[in-house]
Design a protein with these regions (language model features):
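Self-processing/autoproteolytic domain segments and adjacent N-terminal interaction modules in large
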Residues: 157-266
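Beta-strand-rich interaction surfaces with strong enrichment in secreted/lumenal proteins
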Residues: 57, 115-117, 211-215
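Amphipathic alpha-helical substructures
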Residues: 1-85
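Short acidic/polar inter-strand loop motif in beta-rich domains
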Residues: 141-153
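Surface-exposed loop/edge segments in extracytoplasmic proteins
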Residues: 109-117, 259-268
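Short conserved micro-motifs at the rims of enzyme active sites and ligand-binding pockets
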Residues: 95-98, 148-151, 236-238, 265-267
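Short, intrinsically disordered, charge-balanced linker/junction segments flanking boundaries
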Residues: 1, 268-274
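Beta-strand-rich binding/interaction modules
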Residues: 66-69, 73-138, 251
């Protein structure tokens, strides 16, 4: 399905008007004949005036997908709130370094601040000033890119069970609190950071991890089920099959508030094997 993922990302990269104009030019000039990806790239460049070389090198001619995440945030108050946002770049299926414009959204209960930045290194830092006091900060909140993250965001209006599609997470909301809350689950399809200190004796997944953010009203409380799968099923497997190669009784759930902290084993967790 990478072709559809690339097309989705290309629309964001070029903007819809230029993207569809480029597709029309491509069909007019190459229709009913043979064409390749290089010619498609050149047609888009010619019609839009945007040099598409780097995009095609990153997304078409390189296997896999990029992964962009927020490593840490430093806030300095003033007339505006000044946020210094440190990002981290990883990749899925390659060791390629991408150059991509991405949106960073600083979200609170009432108003969001979204800015577009260019991530072009393993680590970057961006300064964003806003009058708001965001509850959480996310990259590509509105899913303009087909990167190595699948996510789902839901406004919680009642207690009970909620499925978070494409994340392998289910919520069971116990109490709402004073008002509605927003929960965002991201399923990251790259290996998490390792332990800061060696010698823990714990091996972390080499394939994926989750993050949870949102706006949580005082008193909001939920349980969550995180589904792992060590099978070789073509439909749902090949996720944890390299990680689970024996019994499952030693599996633990690790958590850290952010990248500044060490991973810790969560207690009060029920492991359901099978």
């Amino acid at each position: 399905n990478k072709g559809a993922d690339v097309a989705h990302t290309l629309r964001y990269y070029m903007d819809d008007a230029l993207f569809f104009d480029g597709c029309k030019a491509y069909m007019n000039n190459r229709g009913n004949g043979n064409a390749n990806s290089y010619q498609f790239r050149d047609e888009l460049t010619s019609s839009s005036g945007i040099d598409m070389t780097r995009f095609f090198d990153d997304w078409v001619f390189t296997p896999g997908f990029p992964h962009f995440s927020i490593d840490s945030v430093v806030m300095m108050p003033g007339g505006l709130n000044h946020y210094f946002i440190y990002t981290r770049q990883k990749s899925k299926g390659n060791s390629h370094l991408y150059n991509m414009q991405v949106e960073i959204t600083l979200a609170d209960q009432f108003q969001d601040t979204t800015v577009t930045v260019t991530i072009d290194s393993l680590t970057n830092v961006f300064h964003i000033a806003t009058p708001n006091a965001p509850t959480w900060i996310s990259i590509d909140r509105y899913d303009h890119m087909a990167d190595a993250i699948t996510d789902y965001e839901r406004i919680i209006t009642a207690t009970g069970a909620y499925t978070m599609p494409e994340t392998n997470v289910q919520l069971n909301v116990q109490t709402l609190g004073t008002d509605t809350s927003t929960v965002r689950i991201e399923h990251h399809w790259v290996a998490p950071d390792p332990f800061k200190n060696t010698g823990s004796g714990i091996r972390v997944s080499d394939y994926h991890y989750w993050s949870a953010d949102g706006f949580f009203e005082p008193g909001f409380r939920t349980k969550a089920t995180f589904t792992y799968n060590g099978s070789f099923s073509t439909a749902t497997g090949y996720i944890d099959n390299t990680f689970i190669n024996g019994t499952e009784d030693s599996l633990v759930l690790l958590y850290r508030p952010n990248a500044a902290y060490e991973w810790e084993i969560q207690t009060g967790v029920t492991l359901c094997t099978g």
